[in-house]
Every structure is written in C-alpha cells, then in structure tokens.
Amino acid sequence: MFPEEIAMEAPVLNSHNKSEYEPAHSAEHLLNATMVKMFGCPRSRNAHVEKKKSKCDYILDAEPTPEQVAEIEAKVNEVISQNLDVTIGFLTREQAASVVDLSKLPEDASETLRIVRIGEYDTCACIGAHVKNTSEIGTFKIISHSFENGVWRLRWKTIK
C-alpha cells in the first residue's frame, strides 16, 4: 500500500473541473501503464476521456505493429480481468516524487497530492474519478490509431 508517511489530515487539493466516466478513466490509467511497460515511453502526452470514446497520444519512435496493437488491447483486458482494487492515498510532493512520475504535474499543484493505485499495476498522481475495482471497467476496445511525427494517437472505448 502507501508509505506510513501519508498525510492523514484533511489535505488541501487542487479543484477538479471535469467530469469523467469512471470506467474509462481507470482504463486510461491501465493503458498508460501498459504503454510504459511495453514501449518505455512516457504516459500519454494528452488524453481525452469520455464514455462514448476516448483518445490518448504517445510519443514513440515508430508506429506499433498490428501485433503490438493487439497485445496492448489484450494486456489491458487481462489486467481488468484481475479484479484489482483501486485505492487512493495522499502524499506530499516530496514523498510522491519517489513513487510516481511528477513531470506532468502543473506548477500550481497542491503540496499534498492524491495518489491513485490500481493493484500493483499502476500508481499515478491523479485528481479524477475512478472505479473501486477493475471489475467495474468492462472490456477495453481499441477503435483506431494513427501515427504522425512521432506521435501515436490511440482511440479506444470501454464496453460494459
């Protein structure tokens, strides 16, 4: 779980101005972790997550092969099927720096960060809404993808 140094007092967090579809947002975390593990790339450079369909952009040296695309989809679904708990904890920026990548953290982010962990598969600073267990996500389906100028755009959805 989280280190014992978790800030247990009521943390001051940045506000969250978007409403996400929880299954898709949790699936995005699994997709990001899968991409990092398979390709050694950073988490998505930008993401648009909705109930109907979502997209993520990844900086890659080459376009993934059809076999790799199928492997990404299969791996995300394999992790979903493990019925992993999604847990939330709070760490200071200093504590979080040894646990998660803070490179995309806005400069004005709170001193206390909300950390979302999906089993042992993914840990990430996040202020968004999530499912309580991966069993609530459904099936992850890649709709389409394109590659241009080193950016691989992946369009996907979750199906209940």
Region spans (language model):
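Active-/binding-site microenvironments in catalytic and ligand-binding cores
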Residues: 1-160
